[in-house]
Amino acid sequence: MLTKFLASLAAAPLLATAWPHPSQDTFNNVTIFTPPATWTDRSTNYARTVLLNQNCEKEPYTLLSTWSESTEDGAYFPIYQSNDYGRSWDPLSKAYFTHGNFSGGAMLQPFLYEMAQPFGDYPAGTLLLTGNAIPADSSSTNIQLYSSFDKG
């Protein structure tokens, strides 16, 4: 028992030096998006983030973020992009769900996923966005899926 303990103590410095170290300093309290004061409901929900790296991109890596948003323009998932490890963010695109009659409805529970392997007609690196589209009368729940071959 003592021998195992001493062996683990001897191996600890090797593990500490082999552990990857971040190339950037850590930070906190970065605001990605602030709803305009003109919005009647100044809230967002279900924020999600994905690190893109299925094509072995070089640093700096790209982060994408999305969330649920309902505005006068309709419900959509905004896509924001960061190329500096999340220190700053810029709008990249918006995903509107257009199948069915969702006028005045809600889009909830977004999820971003970058495919690690090819599947059917989708190559590795394809970005998938899925969400729950609910019509204004709440008569159904509709899981919708969109794909992007250009990272957003």
Regions found by a protein language model. Name each.
Residues 1-21:
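Fungal secretory targeting signals
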